[in-house]
Structures are given as structure tokens and as C-alpha cells.
Amino acid sequence: MTPSISWGLLLLAGLCCLVPSFLAEDVQETDTSQKDQSPASHEIATNLGDFAISLYRELVHQSNTSNIFFSPVSIATAFAMLSLGSKGDTHTQILEGLQFNLTQTSEADIHKSFQHLLQTLNRPDSELQLSTGNGLFVNNDLKLVEKFLEEAKNHYQAEVFSVNFAESEEAKKVINDFVEKGTQGKIVEAVKKLDQDTVFALANYILFKGKWKKPFDPENTEEAEFHVDESTTVKVPMMTLSGMLDVHHCSTLSSWVLLMDYAGNATAVFLLPDDGKMQHLEQTLSKELISKFLLNRRRRLAQIHFPRLSISGEYNLKTLMSPLGITRIFNNGADLSGITEENAPLKLSQAVHKAVLTIDETGTEAAAVTVLLAVPYSMPPILRFDHPFLFIIFEEHTQSPLFVGKVVDPTH
């Protein structure tokens, strides 16, 4: 193999988010004192917040008429792990594209931050069913740099698999089996085709199963209309929930804000724009505003109508990451010499991200809650999520955005 020939690398960020919403007895006030406020945790949350919003806006720029769903944590983890073996401009572009300021944060601290994040997400004692995994798939005649392997295992809990990429169907099956097992069967064909020059693949997945602290009662679910746009309406099963809910109107965003807690340590922030204000919401949304919503919890008597939904996202990360400044890794100028000891250069030939989300009121019974309330001075708000809205799901200990989505059509 001469140095003029470039070998291919596949990057796969695959995930599943499944959200059943039963088996919770009561709502507890959020204890912000229990949040992990370590420097590493704060650093990763800040950068992932910026990264999440940048990615979201790029996806909206590519298409503002379709559902959006992705995991900032999954994508960032995959690229950060790849940066362990990158050098020069390739290295700088990756970390700066992930919104890290390299003059303020050392590379060692960045990887320690991801290490801490993954340890937190994979805690076995958490009520939240949340797990992540990283797989390195190496051609059986390719020798990787030992330092890269050690750091990938230490900081990113990576598993290493030896495969024969010359047998593309066999190699594809090994990768797909890893993702399918990690996502408990929610993603069954993460890789559809392998480039013929692929010799190394990196796969990341994240699986999330959450149960609402305050569940929906399936008996209250009725068919209702969802307005995709001014001329399109679809029928959806609309769930209903009443009681003391964390909901308020944000004049800055011209949107209603609803916070829903999961059993464990996760919170979903739903943003329902006023009529004609979706573009304003998307342009104005910031991590600072989201942080305020998470810190300043306010419950009031309210009723919400929310669609049962299932959406997915599949993205070519080359077109998604390039506007964020990550370009060198995809072309022949890529410097990934810290990954392999071979003379032939390595470049990222494929980069795929897949995501699946289900929100429903799974289960045959919901918790019974008796609430005694004083008569309010004003009528409680009734929120109908019957037109496009945004949402972000956070892990509370690290305040990291696990998932970001936009629901344009809940039936697709």
C-alpha cells in the first residue's frame, strides 16, 4: 500500500431514545443541590449546549419543513474520541467544531470531561435507563497506535473488534450487531453499505428509556388534529395531562415552555411557539435561556394535550459538520496519523448519525394522584401541542443535552 492511497474510515453515531411514560407515583421537586457541578461537568455541559444549538440551526437551514431528531452527546463523543488520533489542523478543527476554546481548555481536560460524562450516563444505580457505548472496528491486518487504543478505552470506554473489511457483508454484520445489541433492537441496520476502502470504523450509540414522573393516563388519549402547516393537518392520538405542571410563557421566545421530569435524572424541555413564531423561536433560543428554565422551576395548575409520537433522524455528518468548520477530516488532507502505525493515510470516508424517538403513555395503568388545590385567581392555561414544536432532553447531573428535536409531523 503506497502512501498516495488513502484508506477509508467509517464514523457511525447511532442511538435510540425510547420514552414510555408510566410507573411513577408522584412528582418531586427538583433538588438542584444534588446536581454535579464539578468543573469537568460544567465544561462539557457548556460546550455541548453551544454545539447542540449550532447543529440544530444547521439542520433547520438544510430543511425547515421536516422532523429533526439527533443526539449532541452521541455525535460529540464520536468526534472527540476520533480527535485522540488526529493531528494538526484536523485535530484543531474537530475540537473547535465541538465548540471548545483551546486557549481556555486543555485537551486533557476535554477528554476528562467526556470520561466523566460517560461514567455519569452509564451509572448502573440510576432509575433512568440510560447507557452509551463506543465500538472500534479494526481491519484484522491493521495495527493501531497503542496510545490511541489506551486513551479510547480509558476516556471513552471503547470496545475493540477485529474484523475483515474485505468481507464487507461480514464486517457490516459485526458493526450492526454491536449497535443493535446496544440499542436493544431499536436500530437494526445502522450501516447499509461500506465503502470498499474502509479499514477502520468507529460506532457510538446511546440508549434512553425514561418513565415520566407524572404519567399520562391512556384512557384520556383521544384522536385529534395536528396542524403540520397552514394547509396540512394529520390525525394523531392526543394524550392529556392535568395538574400542577411546570409551564410558563416566555415572552423572549414568544413560546410556551413545558418541563417534564423523568424518574431518575432527566428532564425534557418542550417549546411550543405562538402562532407564526417558530422562526423567531429558532433564531432566539440560547443555552442561557434553557439554563434559566432548568434552574427556575415554577409549577402551576395547567392542562396539556400532547401527541403520541414516533420520529427518527438520519444524517450525513459530512454535510452537517462541514459548516461548523470540521472539513479536513473528510478529505485527503486529513491527518489521522495518531490512529494507525501504517504509512497509508487515513480519512473519514463515511460519517452517519441515526436517531429514533418514541413518546407515548405505555402501560395498562397510570398512577393515581389526588391533588387538593386552592382556587386560582386566573384560569389555568391549556396547552395544545397541536402544531410544530421543539424539545431538548437533559441529563440533570451534568446538565448535558442528550437529545434535541423538532416535531413537524408526529406521524412520520
UniProtKB/Swiss-Prot annotation:
Residues 1-24 form the signal peptide. The reactive center loop (RCL) extends out from the body of the protein and directs binding to the target protease. The protease cleaves the serpin at the reactive site within the RCL, establishing a covalent linkage between the carboxyl group of the serpin reactive site and the serine hydroxyl of the protease. The resulting inactive serpin-protease complex is highly stable. Variability within the reactive center loop (RCL) sequences of Serpina1-related genes may determine target protease specificity. Coiled coil: none annotated. It comes from Mus musculus. It is found in: Secreted. It comes from the Eukaryota. Residues 368-387 are annotated as: RCL. PANTHER family: ALPHA-1-ANTITRYPSIN, SERINE PROTEASE INHIBITOR, SERPIN. GO terms for molecular function: serine-type endopeptidase inhibitor activity. Glycans are attached at residues 64, 101, 265. CDD domains: serpinA1_A1AT. This is Alpha-1-antitrypsin 1-3. GO terms for biological process: response to cytokine; response to peptide hormone. Pfam families: Serpin. Gene3D superfamilies: Alpha-1-antitrypsin, domain 1 (2.30.39.10), Antithrombin, subunit I, domain 2 (3.30.497.10), Serpins superfamily (2.10.310.10).
